[in-house]
Design a protein with these regions (language model features):
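Short, mixed charged/polar active-site loops
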Residues: 51-53, 114
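Core segments of cupin and vicinal oxygen chelate
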Residues: 7-51
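Flexible, glycine-rich phosphate/dinucleotide-binding loops
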Residues: 35-37, 62-63, 121-124
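Intrinsically disordered, low-complexity acidic/polar segments
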Residues: 53, 65, 124-126
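Vicinal oxygen chelate
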Residues: 2-11, 29-32, 42-46, 62-139, ...
């Protein structure tokens, strides 16, 4: 058995690609538009980790995703959680659970998907402003 990908439904291709690619730093691997099925699939991955993909599915006809069709969270490892969180904040992303422990943070995508950010290797030493930053919303 081989892991293939996780699928997340999105409401806006532009907002989602801005968030995932421009702010979070993942890359678009491929895209497929299905005119008959009226949807677009976009496959993303962290640079250097192209085998672990996230599939963004955009259904062209508006649809509310509720009743168990939502998702727990995605998780990405990073070389420096403080640098990534600062970059995200500088680009307007709310850090819902700051990396107070130097190891873990949570953010949300434009479609409210929870994303866990994990420090690769050992946790960084606790540091400000993260150490005293409160949680914002839910994660």
């Amino acid at each position: 058995m081989k892991y293939l990908h996780s699928m997340v439904r999105i409401s806006s291709v532009d907002d989602s690609l801005d968030f995932f690619c421009n702010k979070l730093g993942v890359i678009e691997l491929r895209r497929h538009d299905d005119d008959k099925g009226r949807y677009t699939n976009i496959f993303l991955a962290a640079p250097g980790n192209e085998d672990a993909m996230v599939e963004l599915t955009h259904n062209w006809d508006p649809e509310e995703y509720a009743g168990g069709r939502n998702f727990g969270h995605l998780a990405y490892g990073t070389e420096n959680i403080y640098t990534l969180c600062q970059h995200l904040m500088d680009n307007g992303v709310t850090i819902n659970r700051p990396p107070r422990d130097g190891r873990m943070a949570f953010i949300r995508s434009p479609d409210n998907i929870s994303i866990e950010l994990l420090q690769q290797g050992d946790a960084l030493a606790p540091a400000e402003p993260w150490l005293s930053m409160p949680n914002t919303g839910s994660w």
